[in-house]
């Protein structure tokens, strides 16, 4: 029942408020930050829930006045007004009660890999990185390149970056998948349009203790930094390569060379490694769930083409959307204007979840008193 869920959240809200008011909580910054985020998530829900309880009581009182001929007309107007507001609150609560992604508040490990198209794909990877950097800045986030494999003509065959800030994963999670570009390369003398691809992976950054990595299974190599992220620091062995289970099918290689400090590069490399291991575990778990329910899940698969950037027509098409809603102005998107696409995808996801919630509940309006 919705009312039971709201009662549970109201009780949790009280516990969170009391915990935040405890001076001893300041000794644990990580837990304090977690509780602060949770308080922020619960506040709009509990505020509406309490308003619903007050208005429900007022509505009951107004209905009692219908028996009084002198008050009937006034009561009827009050009933209509209260009923309209209650319906609005219930609709808002339905949306707020939709399941949230537990990874939304995490930082992001962003990986771009040039695919089909050779040098042109590598150039487009740099264009996407520039787009993401501008998008991050506009969203109040920070994007920092950890490692990049430069290619000819100023492209990059691979880029690994970290995006930090409040709800970074929520801002970037829709970017995972294959991005296709259609344009005339600078090296094309005949003016022919080429099609190239870049694969983007978006990993929620693993938090401390989330994934256990056995140090004996990781080989650490150090070398002199070079290329993007390493300029000016290549006089010492500050770059770090972490190799998980080297020489086995499970091998994972992570390189970090953005800092002048070998210690900091090592720490960041291990964070990226843990994030990849967590993603591997999530992917395996999701695959088992798909096999169990014998269903195919499309949106979000890394191998899926999610978006096409058509330069001749100045159009970006997101293939997860439908109709005219799937097309956006390319120049705006490449300047970092991803927010409209993210909003449209998030809206579609909420609508899908809402339909599932309504189907599970069977009926609406089951809201109890606070």
Swiss-Prot record:
Methylated by PrmC. Methylation increases the termination efficiency of RF1. One of its GO terms (cellular component) is cytoplasm. It is found in: Cytoplasm. It holds the Pfam family PCRF. Residues 284-303 are annotated as: Disordered. It comes from the Bacteria. The lineage of its organism: Bacteria, Thermotogati, Deinococcota, Deinococci, Deinococcales. PANTHER family: LD18447P. It comes from Deinococcus geothermalis (strain DSM 11300 / CIP 105573 / AG-3a). Peptide chain release factor 1 directs the termination of translation in response to the peptide chain termination codons UAG and UAA. Keywords: Cytoplasm, Methylation, Protein biosynthesis. This is Peptide chain release factor 1. GO terms for molecular function: translation release factor activity, codon specific. The modification N5-methylglutamine is found at residue 231. Residues 284-293 have a biased composition (Basic and acidic residues). Signal peptide: none annotated. Belongs to the prokaryotic/mitochondrial release factor family.
